[in-house]
Amino acid sequence: MNQLEKYKELLLKWNKTHNLVSKSQARNLDEHIEDSLSVSDLLGPEVLDLGSGGGFPGIALAIKNPTKKFYLVESNEKKSAFLLNTSNQLELKNVKVYNKRIEELLPERFPNNLEIITRAFGSAAKTIKSSEHFL
């Protein structure tokens, strides 16, 4: 079983108790993975995924880009536990999970060339306001 298939299996298993994705998202995981991977060629070497939730786009991108480093930020403890467990199960050495709000993170602890991505975190205004200390 490849890593993306294993990721989908873990996501569906954990979703039963952790509400990681909606029922409609669970039925269309391939579509959400494909959507997440659509930015793959545009990313630099260091990426912060804001509001990682069930791992879209961070986990999917980390699987397809093993030479890039991904910092997954998720304030929900259950979702963070899923992200940490999944990155360990998939042996994703390029993933670091932070169970914090973005406002709590110190930019100086991250690379200067860090790129920020997000999917369903909130409006553009909310995303910019929450992460402005990284910009």
Language-model segments: which ranges?
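Residue-level preference for alpha-helix termini and adjacent loops
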Residues: N19-L20, G55, A120
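Conserved SAM-binding loop of SAM-dependent methyltransferases across substrates and taxa
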Residues: G54-T67
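Class I SAM-dependent transferase core
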Residues: N2-P45, K78-V95
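Acidic active-site catalytic centers that drive phospho-/nucleotidyl reactions
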Residues: D35, D49, E74
